[in-house]
Amino acid sequence: MTNTSETTKTAIAHGNYVRGSASKVRRVLDQIRGRSYRDALIMLEFMPYRSTDPITKVLRSAVANAEHNYGMDPSTLIISSAWANNGPVMKRYRPRAQGRAFSIKKQTCHISISVESAPTQINAEVQN
């Protein structure tokens, strides 16, 4: 048996130990997943969330990896997958009244974005 499926090259970039919770980063990643590189950059520029800056940095790194490692054209790239996982939690303490202390959890996350070249659509016209 021969495998006739075409393999696509995928470039991945990771941003580790990014300050911010994974759930707030996922809110932005859900909006750009499946979009083209240029559309995603425009969306990230105008979103009012703090997590857009590190996401933009990771996205640009993924596109640079695609250009350098595989020679892909940035105008044809789409975001095939994007995810955020929980990172380590930094624990801090805030002094309170009567000798108490409340804990403050400063969350981090790991952002990963993979891009691949968009499938080219060939219009096969039947000529009579």
UniProtKB/Swiss-Prot annotation:
Belongs to the universal ribosomal protein uL22 family. Part of the 50S ribosomal subunit. The keyword rRNA-binding applies. Keywords: Ribonucleoprotein, Ribosomal protein, RNA-binding, rRNA-binding. GO terms for cellular component: cytosolic large ribosomal subunit. One of its GO terms (molecular function) is rRNA binding. This protein binds specifically to 23S rRNA; its binding is stimulated by other ribosomal proteins, e.g. L4, L17, and L20. It is important during the early stages of 50S assembly. It makes multiple contacts with different domains of the 23S rRNA in the assembled 50S subunit and ribosome. The keyword Membrane does not apply. SUPFAM superfamilies: Ribosomal protein L22 (SSF54843). One of its GO terms (biological process) is translation. It comes from Prochlorococcus marinus (strain MIT 9312). It holds the Pfam family Ribosomal_L22. This is Large ribosomal subunit protein uL22.
